[in-house]
Structures are given as C-alpha cells and as structure tokens.
Amino acid sequence: MLRFLRHIPPFLPTLIVLVAICYLSLDADPFPDKDSWFTFPGSDKVVHIIMYGGLTATFCFDYYRRVAAPCKLWLLIVALVGIVMELLQAHMGIGRTGDFVDVIANSLGALIGIVVGNRLFTRLFIKVES
C-alpha cells in the first residue's frame, strides 16, 4: 500500500481537501437542509474542527510522504487559512459572516489534526523506512 501512496502527486490530497473547504466556506448556502440529524447547537463548530483537523492531517500525510519528519509548521499555515476564510466570509458579501469563534474552532481543529497526523504518519512512514 505504501508504494501506491508514494505515487500520488505531491500535495494533491491536500489541494483537494483545501478546495473542498474553500467551496464549503465561501458558498452562500452549502447545506440548504438545516433540519438534518446532525444539526444541534454548536454543530457548525464541530464541522469546523473536523474540516481543519482533516486539512492539517492531510498536510501531515503529504509532508511525511516526502520528508518523513514532524510537520509543526502546518499548524500555523492551516490556522492562517482558517482566519483568511473567516475574513473572506465577512467581507465578500455572499451572505455569510465571519466569526471569531469559528477562527478558534478552525485553530483547534488544526491543533488536533497536527497531533493526530504526526502520531499516525510517524508510525506509518518512519517505521516502514527504518
């Protein structure tokens, strides 16, 4: 399986996840059905944590495939992406609002993603190469 993973173009998985997050963040109404089973107070914050945690873990995956070293810089990069998305939501006039609590959720997701990504991919890539 690792041979297959090494043939994926560099940072393609990260780009795919980033484009999906941009679409979901900047579309006026990406989920028109507000009465789904997943809707509860604070559910949007859970979604932010999952999205940005997934983005950071994907960055770690791509980084480890090439470098096989911890990727702490991605925490800052993904947190900045989250801040930029919230600023764009606030100022683009698309019917969305930027929210400081969303920035916190994005950053928390990035932190969780870096911890999970570093632990998971250290074991996956570094043990195999040793």
Predicted regions and their residues:
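"…centered on the first transmembrane helix and the immediately adjacent amphipathic helix/loop
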Residues: 1-61
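Membrane-helix interface segments
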Residues: 8-9, 66-73, 96-100
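Small-polar-interrupted transmembrane alpha-helices in polytopic inner-membrane proteins
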Residues: 13-25, 73-91
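Short helix-capping/hinge motifs at transmembrane helix termini and TM-loop junctions
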Residues: 26-28, 64, 93, 121
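Residues within alpha-helical transmembrane segments of multi-pass membrane proteins, especially transporters
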Residues: 27, 58, 80, 84, ...
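Interfacial helix-loop-helix junctions of multi-pass membrane proteins
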Residues: 32-36, 85-111
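Membrane-interfacial alpha-helical segments at the cytosolic side of multi-pass membrane proteins
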Residues: 51-65, 109-121
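Short, charged juxtamembrane terminal tails flanking transmembrane helices
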Residues: 124-130
